[in-house]
Amino acid sequence: GPRLSYEQIADRFIVVEGFRAWAVQEDVSLGPNFSLTAIVSDPTFGGDSRRLLVAGRGHAAGRRGRWLLLGDTWFSGRLEDGAAHNLVAGIQIGAAQLGLKGWQIRLLAEGSRRLDRDRQLTLGADIGLRGWDPNYYDGTGRALLNVQWRKLLKKEVLGLFSF
């Protein structure tokens, strides 16, 4: 069916080093960036039933001295028979000290409503965790707090010399 989308990406980027990788420069979008999408499904357009699919994302970041502060939010789902189905919404807030050593902190929370049977919010590698027993959660929501101290132990020059 018909699709209506809007996306805004602010032309505000900074170049940082020591955020996700030690020795490379990265472009970080400061935003605010967001996108919204709605798709209408209807038998008139070849769909099997009437429903409205929706999705949206938002992102903002800022730099305060050596700290990079990040925020993200998102939602997706569908409206069908007057109710929300397969609805997932979440928020993530993070902070990282830039440079060769520093703290990285992340708080993520995600919830759902009437998930389809083939969808689950897992505590797996997609959000940085491994080895969690599935008996500890029902797959309808998740929350995660990461706090880590990072320090570069040795630095390489041209992949030949380490110091």
What is each PLM-predicted segment?
Residues 1-162:
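C-terminal outer-membrane beta-barrel translocator/porin domains of Gram-negative envelope proteins
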